[in-house]
Design a protein with these regions (language model features):
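Short, small-residue-biased leader/transition segments that mark boundaries at the very start
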Residues: 1-11
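Short, charged beta-turn/beta-strand-edge "cap" motif at the junction between a beta-strand
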Residues: 170-173
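Double-stranded beta-helix
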Residues: 188-204
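Catalytic core of non-heme Fe(II) oxygenases with the double-stranded beta-helix
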Residues: 88-165, 175, 182-183, 197-202
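Histidine-centered catalytic/metal-coordination loop motif
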Residues: 20-45
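Signature of the catalytic double-stranded beta-helix
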Residues: 39-105
Length: 204
């Protein structure tokens, strides 16, 4: 797992604003929304999911941002320089009250998710639970099973401008939120890097 750091809040804010402006226009354009619809290929039970066009990925800086983050991540973790970053696809998830994304994983080598809009409140426990973290609207990463001194899940509270990167096979889910009619808007992607760097166990 890698959280984007060190690239500057202003730069990330510009990307978020550019993408949100583009998305708002797509939402208003019914024919374009239908053309870019990606929901039938995804597992989410949410209001809308649609693919990003190549032009906006270039103009917003989203594609370069991903390439830079992944390159830095691989260098920090493996001390290796990637020579290939192929963005396979990127899409928007528009989630509203009581909607969710079940446990799933992605294709490619590297995947990730980031947050473009987050409601002010995501709800609270139905019962009084003082010592239990409320997870409505959270992104949860899942790997293996719980063992001694080792948790199998990691919960991420969504915050606008935060972006997370992980291997494509890492299972994850998004919990429903409640008591708020506002939109939770996220962005995801799949990408390939050098096969000899990704395939640490030898040739496939």
């Amino acid at each position: 797992l890698r959280r984007s750091r060190g690239l500057g809040d202003v730069y990330k804010r510009q990307i978020v604003n550019s993408l949100n402006s583009y998305i708002d226009n797509i939402v208003e354009n019914k024919s374009k929304s239908k053309e870019l619809n990606h929901g039938e290929k995804l597992v989410g039970d949410v209001t809308q999911e649609f693919k990003l066009e190549e032009q906006i990925m270039k103009e917003s800086g989203w594609g370069n941002f991903l390439a830079n983050c992944v390159s830095t991540w691989i260098d920090l973790e493996l001390k290796k320089k990637i020579s290939k970053f192929q963005l396979v696809n990127s899409w928007i998830v528009r989630q509203f009250e009581n909607e969710y994304n079940p446990t799933h994983w992605h294709g490619g080598h590297i995947s990730g998710a980031g947050f473009l809009k987050v409601p002010e409140t995501l709800g609270k426990h139905v019962q009084e639970k003082q010592n239990r973290e409320y997870r409505g609207g959270n992104l949860q990463l899942i790997h293996g099973s719980r063992m001694f001194l080792c948790h199998s899940t990691m919960n991420i509270v969504p915050k606008v401008g935060d972006f997370y990167f992980f291997p494509n096979y890492l299972m994850h889910t998004v919990f429903p939120f409640k008591n708020n009619k506002d939109e939770r808007r996220s962005i995801s992607f799949n990408a390939y890097i050098d096969n000899d760097i990704y395939n640490v166990y030898g040739k496939a």
